[in-house]
């Protein structure tokens, strides 16, 4: 363990001051690494300034992703994880159990002062439970966001994690209010902004064309990007067929680029869904996908994270969901909830093509400096570590 020196306070959260503050950072899937990359960069920056803080990067292995090669980590400019717990596969319950068992051994072998979790994947919840059972502080990045839809596994993960966390890092005033209503103390809540946007802004100049961009003769703002993966949209054959019919028939013949999720690809094959201007492509890397989004006319999606990126890039976003845990993308940004009824797609696309889509703005503190604020809170800039 780190050597004890004295006690200090981080805005109401009491920690012990150590020669080295040790943080364990948890990631379970590719989007988690995209979110923790700027946090690692912020830690490295303060280390270079002489601050005594160390981190250990733990990959639970929750999601196997063929795009997570060595190149992926090089692109994000972060090191490979210190350990991969190898907890992929199985049902949600089995995966939760595997992660908890493996992370308990990891944390007992490598104790720390704080476990930092991000987002709402199963690893976020499972590692938070283990940390608290081992009397270790938990900080949750993207705390307080809620869809209020308990049919979403992610919503359950958020609720459990926020019930256990000691420090909450939030993306919006709505998240702050949610946490206060759920009993969090004001001094535990730190409105810092959105780490996903830190990564987005840091990589603007690195975005690169996918290999197919020129061969398909894509032109700026003259194609649509489509992503679908949620059960509500892809698990019912008739509904999925209707959804694709409404999309393909109402985009004025523009190419539709669909980087397809493996579970969706299987359904498409079974149903034989196709259209002359529908191009189904393999999943893309972070830099290629965001190049595609940055230059498209609009995105049609059922994802949450993409709605944040389109808001900052000023790209119209049509979300095929009945709710969102990121309401600021609708109230401030370029996103609109279309719902899960396929018949609502045509009116939304008519609005887009008539030039009546809202311009949108960027939410407060989504400025590319969120990770720096997170580390400032954890270190407490008014105290110097020995």
Summary of predicted features, one role per range:
Residues 46-56, 251-256:
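A generic structural motif
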Residues 117-118, 129, 168, 292-330:
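A donor-sugar binding/catalytic signature common to diverse glycosyltransferases
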Residues 70, 208-295:
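Donor-nucleotide binding loops and adjacent catalytic segments primarily
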Residues 24-27, 32-50, 72, 84-185:
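Active-site and donor-binding regions of nucleotide-sugar-utilizing enzymes
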Residues 61-79:
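N-terminal beta-loop-helix "entrance" segment that forms/cooperates
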Residues 11-20:
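Short, Lys/Arg-enriched N-terminal segments with co-localized hydrophobic residues
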Residues 73, 174, 336-386:
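Leloir-type glycosyltransferase catalytic cores
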Residues 63-67, 86, 164-235, 338:
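A nucleotide-sugar donor-handling region in carbohydrate enzymes
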């Amino acid at each position: 363990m780190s050597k004890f020196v004295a006690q200090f306070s981080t805005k109401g959260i009491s920690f012990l001051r150590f020669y080295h503050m040790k943080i364990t950072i948890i990631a379970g899937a590719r989007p988690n690494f995209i979110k923790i990359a700027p946090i690692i960069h912020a830690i490295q920056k303060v280390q270079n300034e002489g601050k005594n803080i160390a981190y250990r990067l733990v990959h639970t292995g929750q999601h196997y992703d063929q795009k997570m090669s060595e190149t992926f980590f090089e692109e994000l400019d972060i090191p490979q994880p210190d350990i991969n717990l190898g907890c992929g596969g199985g049902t949600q319950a089995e995966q939760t159990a595997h992660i908890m068992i493996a992370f308990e051994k990891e944390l007992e072998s490598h104790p720390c002062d704080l476990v930092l979790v991000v987002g709402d994947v199963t690893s976020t919840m499972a590692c938070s439970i283990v940390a608290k059972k081992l009397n270790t502080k938990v900080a949750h990045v993207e705390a307080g966001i809620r869809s209020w839809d308990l049919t979403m596994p992610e919503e359950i993960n958020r609720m459990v994690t926020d019930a256990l966390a000691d420090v909450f890092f939030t993306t919006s005033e709505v998240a702050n209010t949610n946490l206060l209503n759920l009993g969090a103390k004001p001094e535990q809540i730190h409105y810092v902004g959105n780490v996903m946007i830190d990564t987005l802004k840091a990589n603007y100049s690195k975005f690169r064309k996918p290999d197919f961009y020129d061969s398909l003769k894509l032109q700026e703002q003259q194609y649509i990007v489509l992503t679908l993966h949620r059960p509500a949209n892809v698990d019912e054959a008739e509904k999925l067929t209707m959804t694709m019919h409404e999309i393909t028939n109402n985009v004025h013949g523009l190419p539709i680029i669909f980087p397809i999720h493996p579970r969706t690809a299987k359904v498409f094959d079974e149903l034989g869904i196709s259209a002359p201007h529908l191009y189904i492509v393999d999943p893309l890397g972070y830099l290629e996908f965001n190049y595609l989004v940055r230059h498209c006319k609009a995105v049609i999606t059922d994802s949450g994270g993409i709605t944040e990126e389109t808001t900052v890039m000023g790209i119209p976003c049509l979300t095929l969901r009945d709710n969102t845990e990121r309401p600021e993308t609708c109230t401030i940004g370029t996103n609109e909830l279309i719902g899960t009824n396929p018949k609502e797609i045509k009116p939304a696309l008519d609005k887009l093509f008539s030039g009546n889509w809202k311009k949108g703005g960027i939410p407060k503190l989504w400025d590319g400096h969120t990770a720096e604020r997170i580390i400032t809170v954890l270190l407490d800039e008014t105290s110097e570590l020995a």
